[in-house]
Amino acid sequence: MKKRSLHFLYFICFLVFSVVSCNSENKEETILSKTENSGDEDATHSIEIDTIDPDFEFMPPSPIQIASILKKANMSYEEGLTNKISNADIYSTKFKQTINFGVYACDLAYCVTNDKYEEAGKYLKVAKKMSANIGLESIFQSDHLVERFEKNIGNQDSIMDILFHVQMMTDDYIHDNDLRDLSVIYFAGAWVEGMNIGTHTILGNDDHKISVLLSEQMTIARSITKGLGAVKNQTDDLVDLTDHIEEVVDAYNNLWSVKQEGENIDYLDVELKHEEVVTISEMILELREEITM
């Protein structure tokens, strides 16, 4: 079995841009600036993974791509969209703990980027709690991250610095400790939660915005399914997750509006009908319920 390079995007970086609601130009510039400055480091980090397909190479989206998507979506904070913290106690399997670590990390970023620091502190603590179950506890124990976070509540620049520090530590720790499969699974959890938040926020308000969001995210979904399919230990839960995401992608590709675009489709220009938006959105919400319950 050959090893192929898995160029895995720093997970917090993805989370920030997959759910962030950029409510002001200054906030957008701050986050984009931090991401651009870390670009050189991204290029030097890669994670290898044992793959079933020797020609497979998983390339997640760049931070700029994700930021562009969210600028168009302009999602605002809504109460009750994040995963309940109490749910952390019901996740007993390694798979559930790993994928919901991604969900909670996504919720953390959603709260931080919307200045909901009290809620963010709670999600940081639950992420730390769950990290102990999946082999990432040392990341949250180092540098007194929780204490630093609490001391800097209200200062988004400092909070963002802490999150970017976590992202780099996570990437290095996974690489150094051979925890590669974890990254693909919690990346999938973060993606599902980001889509859940985006769908809830936009659905019924602006079909054009959600059309663009869904269309661009389908490209990411295809990469995720390839990443999940490349994991060597194909458990039933993992296969079910992969199949479910593939069902969403297939349903999207079979929409009338998508088929009308033909082979040279430009996903940015796809305008879905309202009933098509509802169809895909309901599948995403069902998928999110499946992984969090």
Summary of predicted features, one role per range:
Residues 227-293:
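A cross-kingdom marker for long, charged
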Residues 18-21:
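C-terminal motif of bacterial Sec signal peptides marking the signal peptidase cleavage site
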Residues 32-147:
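N-terminal Sec/ER secretory leader and immediately downstream segment
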Residues 154-238:
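Extended amphipathic alpha-helical interaction segments
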